[in-house]
């Protein structure tokens, strides 16, 4: 496919094409352990020095897959600073998830899901969506993003469905490497846009 021809594809086919391309780019990037570790440190430094982090009562993070930026540094710092920390847990046989409070990264996590992602234990307390305070920050993974805040997920809608329930004024931050920031991502009615991007070049407000 010639450069630019993909933009003529119907939205669903374009998303599928972009997912395939982004997965290949991320696989190559994260195969370099030294590079990916440096990226994690750099991204963490940018975020932890931001006012958005300092003002956040709750940090909603994620447990990284092998082709995602590891946010362990951010999560440990949030706990050390006395902030509340939450990570997602998925429901079997559905595309739904909730967030759960965790008190330590040394907790017993489960990987009993189709993505082999670490999830909080059954003893973890679920976040009540209606009680999420303003200025909380959601650090959202994705395969690709654009500068208008569009996010390309893995196609199951976990984050879009959850974030559509959040009514408080929160920060929605897409976390990615700069090589998967693209010009055009089809944005459908149910897609939730990010307010910020975080990558190895900085923490960027998108002023949506």
Feature locations, PLM:
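N-terminal active-site beta-alpha-beta segment that forms phosphate/nucleotide-binding
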Residues: 2-133
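Conserved phosphate- and dinucleotide-binding cores of soluble alpha/beta proteins
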Residues: 2, 93-208
């Amino acid at each position: 496919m010639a450069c630019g021809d993909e933009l003529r594809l119907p939205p669903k086919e374009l998303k599928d094409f972009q997912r395939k391309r982004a997965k290949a780019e991320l696989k190559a990037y994260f195969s370099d352990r030294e590079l990916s570790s440096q990226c994690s440190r750099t991204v963490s430094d940018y975020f932890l020095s931001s006012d958005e982090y300092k003002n956040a009562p709750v940090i909603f993070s994620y447990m990284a897959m092998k082709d995602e930026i590891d946010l362990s540094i951010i999560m440990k710092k949030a706990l050390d600073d006395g902030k509340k920390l939450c990570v997602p847990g998925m429901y079997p046989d559905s595309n739904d998830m909730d967030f759960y409070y965790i008190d330590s990264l040394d907790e017993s996590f489960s990987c009993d899901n189709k993505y082999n992602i670490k999830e909080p234990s059954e003893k973890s307390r679920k976040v009540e969506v209606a009680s999420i305070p303003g200025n909380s920050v959601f650090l959202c993974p994705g395969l690709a993003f654009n500068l208008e805040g569009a996010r390309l997920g893995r196609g199951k809608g976990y984050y879009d469905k959850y974030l559509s329930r959040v009514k408080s004024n929160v920060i929605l931050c897409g976390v990615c490497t700069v090589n998967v920031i693209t010009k055009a991502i089809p944005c459908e009615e149910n897609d939730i846009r990010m307010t910020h991007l975080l990558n190895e070049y900085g923490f960027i407000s998108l002023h949506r």
